[in-house]
Amino acid sequence: MYFNYFPTTMYDPAGDGSAKMVTNIMKRVRVRTNMKKEIVMMDPYDVKENETPEIISDKHHGSPYYHWVVMLMNDISDVNHDWVKSTRQMQKYLLSKYTETQLTETHHYEIPQTSGDTTTMIEVENTTYPSATAVTNYEYEVALNEEKRSIDLLRNEYLGYFTEEFSDLV
C-alpha cells in the first residue's frame, strides 16, 4: 500500500527503446516535525516481544496495510536495523558482532545526573569519575534495543488526513 502512493515513470535501463513503467522509489517524504510533536495526534506505545509494524498496524489501525504509517511516524526506514529486535534476534545479532569475551568487556562508564525530578545516566571517563558504573557491551546493546521499544502511533481519527497529505506530497 505504501508504494501505491508513489508516482510512476517510464524507465529504459538498456537504452534500447523498450522502456517499462516503474514506481519511482527515489521519491522521499518526511513527516512534518510539528505534526510529530502534536501529542494530541499520537498515542505512546511499547512494542511487545515479536511484534512487527504490520501486527501493530493491524491492532491499532485495524489493518496491517498501514504498517508504513507506523514506520514513517517513528523515523524507521529499515525494519531490520531500526526496529526493536526480539530476544532471539538480539542474541543472534550480539553473537555476530561480539565474541563471548567481548560481550562482558566495558563499553563505557556512566554516572547519574539529577535535574529536578529527573535522573538520567550520562557517559563519563572512568579516570574523571572513579565512582562511575561500568556498562558492558552486552548491557549497552540491550539498552539501545530497548530504546526502540517506545514508539508513537498516529491516532485513528488523523489517519485519513495523514494518508491524504502523504498522497499529495508524493
Region locations from a protein language model:
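Cell-surface/extracellular proteins and modules involved
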Residues: 1-170
